[in-house]
Amino acid sequence: MLTACAQQTKNETNMEFTDNVKEALSDNGRIDLNSLQWTREPGGFEVKGDTILITTAPKTDLWQRTYYHFQNDNAPVLQMKTREKFFSFVVKTDFIGSHHRFDQCGIVMYLGSENWLKGSVEYENDEFQHLGSVVTNNGYSDWATTAIPANVKTMWYRFSRREDDYCIECSSDGQAFSQMRICHMPAAADEISFGIYACSPEESSFTAIFSDMKITECAWKAHDGQQPD
């Protein structure tokens, strides 16, 4: 049975997964897709074994206020709930069909329209796309990005929780992960919802493929450098 970050702080030692996190683990350690719940079910989706395909609808998005001034909150989100304080969630995304500006798919922690985070690749043009993350606290979104080649069409993500702090990482092969974002969310202090999303903010549609979803011990280890004052 999995334990969460065993060898870390005393709160983590010998902690067993409970509630929906534990229930969602299938015999091989991957997530039972039947345990996930939709927020805004998409018009087109299909489950094939441990893979889910989501076909986006035009003008679907997640963004709140900052810079653009609009409030978009209609992207389909597929999640599970947990109160566990230490764990990691991993998923592989394939987006060979993305072709229009801002077409995107990735990981999400959606607590409601005013508080959420996401990590994804957003298509820009035939030269580059944005690998980035958005954190929305109290109704205002930010966006941190780096440019990657437009021919990248597969990305792994790892979402980790350490109490009320969160880390998003990405990987091209599902083995070596690189940090994208560390953040704190005041609204995510107890039960959270986390999972996957896909959307097309402009006049576009594509099919996003999610596979190899699993929950593991917390891969984001405790800080071992400078100590608090």
What would you call each of these model-derived segments?
Residues 12-229:
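Extracellular glycan-recognition regions
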